[in-house]
Regions:
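Extracytoplasmic and endomembrane cell-envelope/extracellular-matrix remodeling and assembly machinery
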Residues: 1-2, 8, 12-13, 52, ...
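Alpha-helical scaffolds flanking conserved acidic
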Residues: 16-24, 40, 88-94
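Short, surface-exposed glycine/acidic/tryptophan-bearing loops
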Residues: 33-54
Length: 223
């Protein structure tokens, strides 16, 4: 369900659709994922980077795990990096993974030796050397699934996430009752919220699959 949301945001910004696949490489689309370096959420954002991009991190809410907020931050970051690397998306993705400092240093070293400064020519950490090809390989498999003998699930728009505005804080159990969804599913779709109250210290919205959105809006409006 996250992929639909991210694809919509990437499309709005006219960015390459391959970027939608990065959370697969980063976290397998797990908003609860946390790395050894304390990177969190589907985009695996570290605390300091999160703060630099306005991602609130408190005892009751971590925007790095919020699909909406973290996607906005990740795409903002990549747009900034892309300008820095003159529109080269492979260098942009490499810098997203290892930091722009490392990529710039590797480019400077290659320039000094009279070597090319494209992604494939740079001396980068092993993780980054694998990271970019993984994204490209996933993209190739999706585009040529029949050739690879891969059966892809049929896209189901009703599973896409929708944002439902909250005028007041609401208990997650109440939203579960209104939608017929489980609390655990709601917590996964709204992973930034650490407690059981939505719309309190976190964002003034709740994310639910499209098929439940209208029903929830009506239930909330009727009190």
């Amino acid at each position: 369900p996250y992929m639909y949301w991210i694809a919509g945001q990437v499309k709005k910004r006219n960015m390459p659709m391959e970027l939608v696949l990065l959370p697969i490489v980063e976290s397998a689309f797990d908003p609860h994922a946390t790395s050894g370096a304390n990177a969190a959420g589907i985009w695996q954002i570290i605390p300091s980077t999160g703060r630099n991009y306005g991602l609130k991190q408190t005892r009751s809410y971590d925007a790095r795990r919020d699909v909406v907020a973290s996607t906005t931050a990740a795409l903002d970051m990549m747009q900034r990096l892309n300008k820095m690397f003159d529109g080269d998306w492979l260098l942009t993705v490499a810098a997203y993974n290892s930091g722009e400092g490392r990529v710039l240093k590797a480019m400077k070293a290659n320039k000094a030796r009279g070597k090319s400064t494209d992604f494939w020519s740079l001396s980068l950490p092993q993780e980054t050397k694998i990271y970019v090809p993984k994204m490209l390989a996933l993209s190739d498999i999706l585009k040529n699934s029949k050739r690879y003998g891969v059966q892809l699930p049929t896209p189901d728009e009703s599973r896409a996430l929708a944002r439902v505005r909250l005028s007041n804080p609401v208990d997650i159990q109440q939203v579960a009752d209104m939608t017929g969804m489980s609390v655990s599913k709601l917590k996964t779709f709204n992973a930034g919220v650490k407690g059981s109250t939505l719309g309190a210290s976190g964002p003034q919205y709740v994310m639910v699959p499209q098929k439940h959105a209208e029903q929830l809006r009506e239930s909330l409006a009727s009190g």
